[in-house]
Amino acid sequence: MSISLSESAAQRVSAFIANRGKGLGLRLGVRTSGCSGMAYVLEFVDDLNDGDTVFEDKGIKVIVDGKSLVYLDGTELDFVKEGLNEGFKFNNPNSSGECGCGESFNV
């Protein structure tokens, strides 16, 4: 099982954690939402929960809960800039499609 970050995502997360001044890393998860069924969740982590799995890539700890791991295995978190827009992009090999608005995905 693995979760990875692109170089641009690692730099961005590192900057966010440095600006925040504390934190173990970044939690990556999924929740039920949207028209396709699931949406990604990103949040800072200060403490680990029972059942969390910790991945480390490019010096950044990515924490995933046990229920989300099956949907996220093999995912690469990227940070992209497209014109005036910028944001995190999830390159998830388990995703079989997204809704039209791009807010949710299915497997």
Curated annotation (Swiss-Prot):
Q: Which residues form the signal peptide?
A: none
The reply on keyword Metal-binding is yes
Q: Does the keyword Metal-binding apply?
A: yes
MF terms (GO), sorted A to Z? 2 iron, 2 sulfur cluster binding; iron ion binding
Q: Which Gene3D superfamilies does this one have?
A: HesB-like domain
The cellular component terms of Gene Ontology attached to this UniProt record, alphabetical and capped at eight, are: cytosol
Subunit-level organization: Homodimer; may form tetramers and higher multimers.
> What does it do?
Is able to transfer iron-sulfur clusters to apo-ferredoxin. Multiple cycles of [2Fe2S] cluster formation and transfer are observed, suggesting that IscA acts catalytically. Recruits intracellular free iron so as to provide iron for the assembly of transient iron-sulfur cluster in IscU in the presence of IscS, L-cysteine and the thioredoxin reductase system TrxA/TrxB.
What is the protein's given name? Answer: Iron-binding protein IscA
Q: Which organism is it from?
A: Pectobacterium carotovorum subsp. carotovorum (strain PC1)
| Gene name in the database record | iscA
